[in-house]
């Protein structure tokens, strides 16, 4: 039987990716990022304060919040604010986004400022956390470029780019950038976060159906590296535009 993906893509093909800067008016950085039908609004907000544990240390902080609009999926879900608390998945994802972005920042160069990345999923079709990281990096870059332009900081605090992509084993084949039909029916699902120097920042991998082998893991990481190269090129092109 010939292997095929629901979308018709090849195994090593990303969905169409778009990065639209300055999507909203008020934030220091804002991006609408689209991975196929997954769309995430990422805004970067700068505040001249830091958490209590950093006061007086001359360091900045980068953090993130993540949420999904009630009808970003096939059926409506209540807003977490209406429930009175954030869910475990939400907390896990926003911590992941924050960790990923802190990995590309010299916090001493930022000074005692906090940059908060708000990542709001407008439409979900798989890979929302990886899209959020990829788009939030561009919003973060716009925010720090504005700080430099205004003379608020002297040294550029970004020490590299960060992006993320999903990979998985779908019907026995390693594939890149899973959409929802694949994500909901895969044997292995993995999220990979990397910097543009080829370093891995975070790997999140789970065997959903059956355990994966070392050779399959190597194949998944090779796919992720290929996709990451394309994503870094798209980020650079967006920031140059």
UniProtKB/Swiss-Prot annotation:
Q: Which CDD domains match?
A: RNase_PH_bact
UniProt KW keywords? Nucleotidyltransferase, RNA-binding, rRNA processing, Transferase, tRNA processing, tRNA-binding
Q: Name one GO biological process term.
A: tRNA processing
PROSITE patterns of this UniProt entry? Answer: RIBONUCLEASE_PH (PS01277)
Enzyme Commission code(s) on record: 2.7.7.56
Q: Which domain of life is it from?
A: Bacteria
Q: Return the Pfam families for the record.
A: RNase_PH, RNase_PH_C
Q: Name one GO molecular function term.
A: tRNA nucleotidyltransferase activity
Give the catalytic activity. tRNA(n+1) + phosphate = tRNA(n) + a ribonucleoside 5'-diphosphate
The residues that the entry says bind phosphate are 89, 127-129
The family database entries (HAMAP family) matched by this protein are listed as: RNase_PH
**Subunit structure of this entry?**
Homohexameric ring arranged as a trimer of dimers.
Q: Which family does it belong to?
A: Belongs to the RNase PH family.
Q: What does this protein do?
A: Phosphorolytic 3'-5' exoribonuclease that plays an important role in tRNA 3'-end maturation. Removes nucleotide residues following the 3'-CCA terminus of tRNAs; can also add nucleotides to the ends of RNA molecules by using nucleoside diphosphates as substrates, but this may not be physiologically important. Probably plays a role in initiation of 16S rRNA degradation (leading to ribosome degradation) during starvation.
In Swiss-Prot or TrEMBL terms, this protein is called Ribonuclease PH
- What's the source species for this entry? Xanthomonas euvesicatoria pv. vesicatoria (strain 85-10) (Xanthomonas campestris pv. vesicatoria)
